[in-house]
Amino acid sequence: MCKRNNDALFFTCSLIEQLGRSLHMRRGKVAAELGEAGIQTLYRNADILHCEPIEKVADDVITEFSLQGGDFDNLAEARYTVPDVWTMGKVYARLIEDVSDEDNIVETILQVFTSWIDSLLSDYNAAFYYQPRDYIAECYRQKTCLLYTSPSP
């Protein structure tokens, strides 16, 4: 498990969330388009980037990486209060902290965002994103949502 309360990880995850919202893209697609090198750059420079409003940083990243918009708008589809960018950044960061080793954080960021769990975390009409961090991490490890499975006999 990597270090808890990793500010660079929290900011990087929040920035990917902001990029997804700004571009109307799935967060996994944003991470895939940034690639490991792009995520590494954002992660390494998070202590500087966080000094500006996240919306401006997102605009700069969109320009720098020539990111194009999509048609995924989970905010418009939400029937309930939408969690803010920082809340979702914290959810992703905690999951990555729980499933990553200290030396492969950037690789794990890419793996988590591009995995099956991204669609569950991006569904703000479901209860998944605000489940306990241990539960979300175990679902990720098991590669399935454990919430609706029946207990073994």
Task: Label each PLM-derived region with a short phrase.
Residues F11-Q18, K90-R94:
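A general alpha-helix detector
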Residues G69-W116:
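Amphipathic protein-protein interaction modules
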Residues W116-F128:
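C-terminal accessory nucleic-acid interaction domains of nucleic acid-metabolism proteins
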Residues C2, S14-I62:
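N-terminal interaction modules that seed assembly of large macromolecular complexes
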Residues Y148-P153:
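Conserved small/polar residues in nucleotide/adenosyl-binding loops
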